[in-house]
Amino acid sequence: MMRKKSFWLGMLTAFMLVFTMAFSDSASAAQPAKNVEKDYIVGFKSGVKTASVKKDIIKESGGKVDKQFRIINAAKAKLDKEALKEVKNDPDVAYVEEDHVAHALAQTVPYGIPLIKADKVQAQGFKGANVKVAVLDTGIQASHPDLNVVGGASFVAGEAYNTDGNGHGTHVAGTVAALDNTTGVLGVAPSVSLYAVKVLNSSGSGSYSGIVSGIEWATTNGMDVINMSLGGASGSTAMKQAVDNAYAKGVVVVAAAGNSGSSGNTNTIGYPAKYDSVIAVGAVDSNSNRASFSSVGAELEVMAPGAGVYSTYPTNTYATLNGTSMASPHVAGAAALILSKHPNLSASQVRNRLSSTATYLGSSFYYGKGLINVEAAAQ
């Protein structure tokens, strides 16, 4: 009988012990967690000046000072929920803000780069190094952080080649050669030697004589590629002779076809794009559809992205523009990529590669040979 009593007494004791432990665990779990500290910036009112006073304000509120700034009247502090409340209510505190985290802004790759498969050639290590590209335009903002202008010339009175009061030339230059520097945008050929040849004034206009002078300068100074995102409705014997001479000397000459759109069977391509020695470039959008403004005609050679193109712009910023002016530099950059991989090719060979490997899009009157494919052209 005594054994049975001892047995049940033991069982009762064990049960109470387990119950107590379980209850204790539950009670512990129900306890509120300790307030988590977070980083804040605490700003002080103008009357609070000394470091010791600032430190005391935060310390007396239950926080801890990590750093005091040298110029602004503020300190970085660690505060839990209660300390945060106390600091906010302190009459000597002007503001309290969370110490947020910033991130490096990634480089934007405009849609035109993968559309023409320039990224594939860049990935092979060919980015236009040792190739000289002259942008004949409104000048280039040479101080733009995403551009590296190595030289140039101006044929516009009173305007330097390394400035751009219009924006057109800087935008075109970025499509050709915006740097691969983890910020801003990426150009088709980011490692080219970029030259600014100003032939258009800050209003976006320029004389044919100025353009001829720019072409001659580029030819004389050993440019490998000339881009002309410009055009006129009238032909010019002098301009034709200038581009013919450049092409004969081994320069790949690229020009915008024009923004006159289509009107039945009417040829709307402008000059100098209309000349045989020049690659006339039309514009497509991100879906490879011909842009409605893109000029048409028998001289149209290839198409490139020209609708909604994002690129560099003055001053130290970026902009989205439309036009065959935006398409032409894609082709100029593509020519530079081909030459960086195959430096011994002639201008006519580069041109033939671009046109013969283009992706067919439709009638040559509207699309030329089609959308350029730099990966195929650079094989």
Swiss-Prot record:
Residues 44-102 form the Inhibitor I9 domain. Its main location: secreted. Residues 1-29 form the signal peptide. Binds 2 calcium ions per subunit. Residues 110-378 form the Peptidase S8 domain. Ca(2+) 2 binds at residues 273, 275, 278. Its cofactor is Ca(2+). It is an enzyme of class 3 (hydrolase). Residues 30-105 form a propeptide. Inhibited by p-chlorophenyl and 1-naphthyl boronic acid derivatives. It is found in: Secreted. Ca(2+) 1 binds at residues 107, 146, 179, 181, 183, 185. The active site is at residues 137, 168, 325. PROSITE patterns: SUBTILASE, SUBTILASE_ASP, SUBTILASE_HIS, SUBTILASE_SER. Its EC number is 3.4.21.62. It catalyses: Hydrolysis of proteins with broad specificity for peptide bonds, and a preference for a large uncharged residue in P1. Hydrolyzes peptide amides. GO terms for molecular function: metal ion binding; serine-type endopeptidase activity. InterPro entries: Peptidase_S8/S53_dom, Peptidase_S8/S53_dom_sf, Peptidase_S8_Asp-AS, Peptidase_S8_His-AS, Peptidase_S8_Ser-AS, Peptidase_S8_subtilisin-like, Peptidase_S8_subtilisin-rel, S8pro/Inhibitor_I9. Belongs to the peptidase S8 family. This is Subtilisin Carlsberg. The gene is subC.
